[in-house]
Amino acid sequence: MDEGTFLFLLDTNRAKVLSFSDFNKRNFAPFFFFFFFFFFFFSSSSRIREFVCSATWTRTRALLCTKKHVFLYCFHNTSRENRIFKANKPDVMKDGFAVYMQRATQELFFTNKLNYLLVCVPLAIISNGGGWGDGITFTFSLIAICPLAERLGFVTEQLAGYTNSTVGGLLNASFGNATEMIVSMYALKAGLLRVVQLSLLGSILSNMLLVLGCAFLFGGMSRKEQYFNAEGVMMNFGLLLLAVMGLSLPALLHFTHTELHGTASELALSRFSSTILLLIYLAFLYFQLVTHTHLYEDEEDDDDDDDEEELVLGFWDSIVWLGVFTVFISILSDYLVATIEGASASWDFSVAFISVILLPIVGNAAEHASAVMFAMKNKMDISLGVAVGSSTQIALLVIPFCVIVGWFMDKPMDLNLQMFETATLFTTVITVAFVCQDGRSNWLKGLVLILAYILLSASFFFHKDPALIGRQAASSINEWNEEF
């Protein structure tokens, strides 16, 4: 609907139009919305065919249409393309509740062969309770998180199917990062601050190189070239470079030995920088979702797929399954954090390699699957929103949030990455920004990004983290003192 000035109540027998200005003067808005929601959900009258409300305040609009869908959004822009929730979505229960349950269950658990790995969920729980060893528990937990994260991505895609491409990409990035956020919170609680830093750094690296590279590679196999909105993507890279600045300054302060008050200066600078980065992220959300939505809309595409056929879950069912999968990921994340050092000793892999490479690959399974899926459907703006948008969200939201949470938990969580990690992050952002600057992708660009990630993986395999070595040495000394 255009600039909202009327309220419409459409019935098969009558139609009534009430001037919005008169309606607002009577101050009936709160009563109207209470009555509307009560009527909307509990009315069983078959005469009502359409009930549409469009109301305008300064920057809040409500659009409610059809008897089975409620759509609320807060954009000043009221164009159809910029509505958060799409109005023309099919009823997934049109064939009956039994058919819907059968189809939803099959899609959730039996259509993807990766779901066979869900058997590792009870094995991880049994291993943790039965004392099978840290290496075995860590292995089962790591494997079990992979299908859970992928199913989280599937359910997120179902939920995103009720939204436009901008919010859909944001939803995929947000719930894709749920695994990293949960693991980080448990590691922060356990005092494994370096694991938090390295795992989040690894998430950025894997999203920008591995996930985006796979999206370019598999998307380019069926098309010679694919196109995306370069202006919106380069805005993300500008924010990523700003985040790199915020992450590198505490490290530079430390390694140049110019701190005014030693480590206290690094910690104070990290907390201040984290606050600034969080404010930047909020400003970026307003920029992305309100003032410059056109930069993040999907490019028009002639061979666009029929989204209606892909939706097998209802809106609220998708939200419920998001919660279920998140709970199981939380349980397994607790096991991961508790056994990571024991697994490092069992596998003879460094904690740094496990944190930077193995954990993010599993945690980013949701982004990996959804980004590749959207790229193969030639929806490159959503694919870029998942991969690059997820990296931006980790750099501007998750990492600063962990610093602030650590502050309240009295944990000295800071942004002091080692020089090696800072250099890898900077070179990664520059490389990917150069690849994406022309707004075009092909399979060769994807292969370049994947090979770059393999190079980084090899470098972390041979890298010794001084901070982790010192922590492990201190832990060994404490254990020796307790024994003797």
Please report, for each region that a protein language model flagged, where it lies by residue:
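Long, low-complexity Q/N-rich tracts
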Residues: 31-43
